[in-house]
């Protein structure tokens, strides 16, 4: 979590801790509620795992060129810190301290989520003028587009947009923006996302053989290769399926293994 060196190298931690220490949580939240507990393991996956893959591939290429292998030290905290791309650049170059809802991408502008009449949510990312004009025209408020270029008018603009979104239901807004290229999309539940035509067409759920003739739905590999897509061949085996083989290899006899099973030490 914290790397192989420095004072925290042996310290315990989890995703939420790495994001906190890396400064990410200090500008990912709301002014009235503070930092948001994310439902995605950002530090673990986007921070640690993906950076580890990049590092491993870079080391393989370096070995091919130099013949020398490397030891890779990947810290989820280090990698989370590097995710402060725009906010970090603003602070290091200009001394601008990022905070909750104080810059374009974290709620400090109209780039945000808006509640619908029936309590659902829509995402609005219409940053560019063309997209903003499409957004305002679709809502029947073309005059609002002029406010998007002035930082001091952001609060007024957000309030006006919220009023317009709350006039309509979630389904009405989905239908309204289905044919409008304005960077406006619905906030879907996971069950809705699984059934969305875009995600279904991208084959993001795979059916993996169980070994008994049935299949198990799992998240598919999101990478698309020109020469075919890696496919999982099985879902694994049940816990305890190889207990006997493991115990025999460790020197346990048949009678002792049965005793352990009766005592529910092993499955």
Task: List where the protein language model places each region.
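Flexible, small-/acidic-enriched active-site or ligand-binding loops
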Residues: 151, 210-261
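Active-site-adjacent "lid/gating" segments in soluble enzymes
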Residues: 1-122, 126-127
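A glycine-rich dinucleotide-binding beta-alpha-beta segment and adjacent secondary-structure elements
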Residues: 179-233
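Residue-level signal for nonpolar/aromatic packing positions in well-ordered secondary structure
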Residues: 15, 56, 67, 135, ...
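Alpha-helical scaffold segments in soluble metabolic enzymes
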Residues: 51-59, 87, 134-138, 160, ...
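Aromatic-enriched alpha-helical interface/lid elements that frame and gate functional surfaces
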Residues: 105, 110-184
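Short linear loop/turn motifs
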Residues: 146-161, 188-195, 256-267
